[in-house]
């Protein structure tokens, strides 16, 4: 089966995924609709289920198809945030005058959540992570997306939410992961410490009767460490400080391109194919295009399909 690349398929994600060939994409980067956040008025939409369990069940079914489509060495990156139990009354989540963004929540969920009390955090991200792990995925890491410019909240009895989760899953024990593509530069003080031979080897002081050695590449006497022996980078940490980016389009929940780019650089080889079953405004496709990867997007909302195509096609980054 010939698969069209660099395209956005309009329709239900589960049905569209079933039409894609097995083991055909290298990586999936996505942010599914959050639970109870916004009603887009679509019959098959995800996020407005009666219970969190139903929401998680539907997402698990979608990602089961993603696993089928993913190559054996592929990775899945899922951006997801939590929801709170409310007072039991529902607000109107469809008024465009109140786009509360990725942190907002206009629908009360208290009456639908078993075991949750009013004002409880539901635990949606970990419910999803454990469900996907139980369904066969390897749960490899939980990245914290820390926002320097979070959406303000009116609450006075807890901290304002300023982070979301990015879970990395894999289909197999061994998989493609380019750690150097997203590596971080080491601090100048770290380089000086390593060059001085302090705190970088097996021992912090000489073994009695032996010269002090350090294990940069292999044991060497103290003072013999040169600049070319010291790696200028380190593996990326699991807290990513990335600000949200304003977007003038009609999609209220667009995540920043840098977030998608980081996942793609690590999880998809150059020339590979990135899948997003919840394409929204097209951020994943935009990031893939900018870095020499192909993309396949799926989006239920026809308006967002048009928006994403226009956004990706007009990008000159």
Label every model-predicted segment:
Residues 1-317:
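Core catalytic lobe of class I
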């Amino acid at each position: 089966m010939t698969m069209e690349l660099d395209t956005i398929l309009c329709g239900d994600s589960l049905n569209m995924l079933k039409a894609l060939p097995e083991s055909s994409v290298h990586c999936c980067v996505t942010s599914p609709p959050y639970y109870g956040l916004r009603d887009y008025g679509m019959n098959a939409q995800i996020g407005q289920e009666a219970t969190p369990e139903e929401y998680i069940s539907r997402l698990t079914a979608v990602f089961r198809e993603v696993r089928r489509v993913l190559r054996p060495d592929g990775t899945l990156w899922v951006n997801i945030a939590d929801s709170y139990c409310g007072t039991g009354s529902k607000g109107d989540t469809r008024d465009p005058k109140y786009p509360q963004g990725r942190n907002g929540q206009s629908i009360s969920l208290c009456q639908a959540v078993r075991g949750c009390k009013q004002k409880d955090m539901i635990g949606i991200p970990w419910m999803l992570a454990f469900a996907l792990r139980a369904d066969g995925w390897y749960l490899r890491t939980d990245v914290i997306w820390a926002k320097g410019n979070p959406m303000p909240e009116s609450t006075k009895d807890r901290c304002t939410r300023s982070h979301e989760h990015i879970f990395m899953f894999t289909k197999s024990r061994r998989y493609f992961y380019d750690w150097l593509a997203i590596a971080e530069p080491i601090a100048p003080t770290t380089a000086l410490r390593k060059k001085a031979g302090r705190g970088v080897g097996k021992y912090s002081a000489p073994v009695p009767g032996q010269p002090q050695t350090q294990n940069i590449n292999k044991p060497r006497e103290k003072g013999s460490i040169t600049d070319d022996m010291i790696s200028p980078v380190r593996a990326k940490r699991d807290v990513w400080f990335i600000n949200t980016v304003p977007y003038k389009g009609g999609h209220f929940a667009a995540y920043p391109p840098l977030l998608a780019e980081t996942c793609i650089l690590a999880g998809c080889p150059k020339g590979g194919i990135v899948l997003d079953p919840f394409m929204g405004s097209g951020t994943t496709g935009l990031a893939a295009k900018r870095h020499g990867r192909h993309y396949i997007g799926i989006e239920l909302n026809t308006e967002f399909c048009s928006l994403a195509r226009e956004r990706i096609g007009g990008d000159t980054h």
